[in-house]
A protein has these predicted regions:
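Short, compositionally biased strand/turn segments
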Residues: 1-7, 63-66
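Membrane-proximal N-terminal amphipathic helix
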Residues: 38-63
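Sec-dependent signal peptide cleavage junction
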Residues: 26-42
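N-terminal single-pass transmembrane signal-anchor helix
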Residues: 3-30
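Low-complexity, S/T/G/P-rich flexible repeat/linker segments used as non-globular hinges
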Residues: 122-178
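Structural motif detector for alpha-helix initiation sites
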Residues: 9, 73-76, 168
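Extracellular/periplasmic head regions of type IV pilus-like filament subunits
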Residues: 61-133, 137-139
């Protein structure tokens, strides 16, 4: 009797089924890991923007620290943003919708709030107006949103930070004009 080399049809089918099961398990895990990393990039970039805004506040004497009831808004275009220009998906950060807002609290503490919006032709994605405290939590990646409505305009930003309407004279904006 001659010895046969090779696999039977049953053996080949078994290998294909096993590989299919492995793929069904592996692909969703890889996709969720990539999405989690993209969200972590937004949170990291938002924290970098706050750090750069703090540096800008220390080095630029033209910018006043806010008094109680006031807001200082530093737009992305005004802050020396270093290497933070695009998000992990290649979207450019919007210069008018991305900013850091400083709020003076009742206990003489300056709160930093950030909004970071990456835009392309069809959608936006980023971190809606959020406090530095919230960005420091382990759940910060849950703050990243897709196709959200950014908080824009002095009045809306002031209202979002204080929960009430603030006089336009108490909101100071700093942005570079082209």
């Amino acid at each position: 009797m001659k010895k046969r080399n090779g696999f039977t049809l049953i053996e080949l089918l078994a290998v294909i089924v096993i590989l299919g099961i492995i793929m069904m398990i592996a692909i969703p895990n890889v996709i969720s890991t990539v999405e989690k990393q993209e969200k972590n990039t937004y949170v990291s970039d938002a924290n970098k923007l706050i750090t750069m805004a703090k540096y800008t506040m220390r080095t630029n004497t033209d910018i006043p620290y806010p008094d109680p009831g006031q807001v200082v808004i530093l737009y992305f275009s005004y802050i020396d943003n270093g290497d933070v220009e695009t998000d992990s998906e290649g979207r450019t950060y919007d210069l008018e919708q991305s900013y850091v807002a400083l709020k003076h609290t009742d206990d003489k503490y300056i709160e930093y709030w950030v909004q970071l919006v990456g835009v392309d032709a069809s959608s936006n994605r980023g971190v809606p107006l959020t406090s530095e405290v919230e960005l420091g939590k382990d759940t910060a990646i849950n703050l990243v949103r897709k196709n959200f409505t950014p908080t824009e305009g002095k009045a809306a930003i002031g209202y979002r930070l204080y929960g009430r309407t603030i006089s336009a004279s108490d909101i100071f904006e700093f942005k570079k004009t082209v």
